[in-house]
Amino acid sequence: MDKAQRYLTAGTRENTRKSYRAAIEHFEVTWGGFLPATAEGIVRYLAEYADSLALSTLRQRLAALAQWHVSQGFPDPTKAPHVRQMLKGIRVVHPTRQKQAAPLQLRHLEKAVNWLNSKAADAVESGDYRALMRYRRDAALLLIGFWRGFRSDELARLQVEDTQAEAGIGITFYLPYTKADRDHQGSTFHTPALKKLCPVEAYINWINVAGMTRGPVFRKLDRWGNLSEKGFKSTSLIPLLRRILEEAGIPAQSYSSHSMRRGFATWASANGWDIKGLMSYVGWKDMKSALRYVDASNSFGGLAAFSPGRIDHDDPESSS
């Protein structure tokens, strides 16, 4: 790979490159299409898979085909009016409700963290260092994931050397890039220390027991308690989250890695955060992205039987 190609490749996310390659292969090999394509060919391709693939998947396939044509210097057939009309028709004939992760409710977060802290105390008493590391790590993962609203890939990319935590004050994370930071300018995220369910305390507890000074914040532990040098893969966080919640006695099948992010957004909305403050804190750049995570906050006041953003005693304090 020459220098120019190296930088051109670096300008596109690895996951995007993989998904685009898979989309082009599906068009050429699975369906038998030819590149460069015509708008009529794109329409036939969409018609073939309209009833078997989600509209979001079809849009991703079109994005890949568009990128291929533009990068090769050909006109983009996906922008043709009848291709857009075809997408509209698919949406009408095959209406689907957009799937959303269930928000992790604050009461479930509290129950899981209390269980983890109790198990950590038992591990200290019994001298089980491996178990102590696991419970400290899992508590930090839950609390940082919830209160910062990080995506799974962002949690997986957190580095100890780019994190500063001060007990009773707050914690600051730096990420070289995020999904919203398309120009890779880097972003800094701050969260204050809380009176309870505190991500700062959980992080410090985890770092101290693990003895880490550099490298990924969240890593695998083997059966003997040895800490991996490599960080979690983002895809491993969903089964890990579900395992933690299940072990704490919380039904977890409806939860995904987005549940912590959506849970925080639900809590913040219920506690008076305006949408601009929430967008700034989490890092959303457009309103549409933010609103996908926030449940409508119509208040029924004291008549409401249950509020997902409230627990029975004093809520943790946070600020935007």
Segment roles from a protein language model:
Residues 1-320:
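Extended, non-catalytic subsegments within catalytic or DNA/protein-binding/adaptor domains
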